[in-house]
Amino acid sequence: MQIGNLSVENPLFLAPMAGVTDWAFRTVCARLGAGVTVTEMVSSRALVYKDQKTAKLLRKNEGSLCGAQIFGNDPEIMAQGARLALEISGCDFLDINMGCPMPKIANSGDGSGLMRTPELAQKIVEAVVKAVNVPVTVKCRLGWDKGSINGLEFTKRMEDAGAAMVTVHGRTRSQLYSGVADWDMIRKVKAQLSIPVIANGDITGPEAALRCAKWTGADGLMIGRSCFGDPWVFQQVKAAMAGEEIPQRPVLKDRIAVAVEQFQLAEQDHGEHVACLEARKHFAWYLRGVSHSGFYKQQISSLTTMEDIYRVAKEISRDLQ
């Protein structure tokens, strides 16, 4: 698959997710089979105003292609922000967020709010394409709500504006993450565009991935919430798509070792305090579905040092299966 002049050998994408896909987690997912990662979304305006905290979110991971994702609704600010994002990160492509459904983003006209103003969205893509020398991609939804589904028209505008690829989450903004993703609509988007289309939504594992790929004809798949605490889903989906035997998830002890490695990377990136805050969230996800893990989840909720992490990890590996 090609994203503009960028060759993609493994079109299995890790979705950009605020508060989740930091450098540490992207690094782990890339090692375990994600072919393309995207940073957490960053504000174009914050980049222009030289906010250092925002800039730190753009660290490029190794082991996969990596895109920098920005959001905003002013074409000129977005163009400036795009240039800065690439200067800071050295990422392989620039992704524009037109899919975030969170109220503080969407109600400000950013993220999925741009699906209510398709002409402005088109101007933003045109401005960003002119401003940067890497492929520009767009992530969007089906529309604002059930009564205003405009995904077909919207994605055609993105292509006309110069987008090199679109990723479509098969839900409207008003659905947030509820209901069932509409793969049929993604199929229709794929049928009308000549640029690559990536399917996103309800790709929960290898079986769902095969069904989605077959039904939509999408050029690639993007996995989001299904990888929380389970980065091995990329390994499994990659094998399924290649027609190979699907590997089993590692035993708990080995999964915990990967979790600890992730938190060590987070410490390198953010320092101990932030790494422990991230660990409280991610560690609990790594224990989803593990019997008798409630006691340890309570301990995880109050982690404050890396030594706490090592101690709890050792106890879990000893006591649980």
Language-model regions, residue ranges each:
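Alpha/beta enzyme core
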Residues: 79-110, 118-195
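Alpha/beta catalytic cores of nucleotide-metabolism and tRNA/nucleoside-modifying enzymes
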Residues: 4, 8, 12, 18, ...
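N-terminal small/glycine-rich loop or linker at the start of catalytic domains
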Residues: 1-13, 45-65, 100, 104-108, ...
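Glycine-rich, positively charged N-terminal anion/phosphate-binding segment
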Residues: 2, 17-92
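Active-site beta-loop-alpha junctions enriched in small/polar residues
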Residues: 17-19, 42-44, 71-73, 99-101, ...
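Aromatic- and acidic-residue-enriched carbohydrate-binding clefts of CAZyme catalytic domains
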Residues: 115
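Hydrophobic faces of well-ordered beta-strands that scaffold small-molecule active sites
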Residues: 12-16, 37-39, 66-70, 94, ...
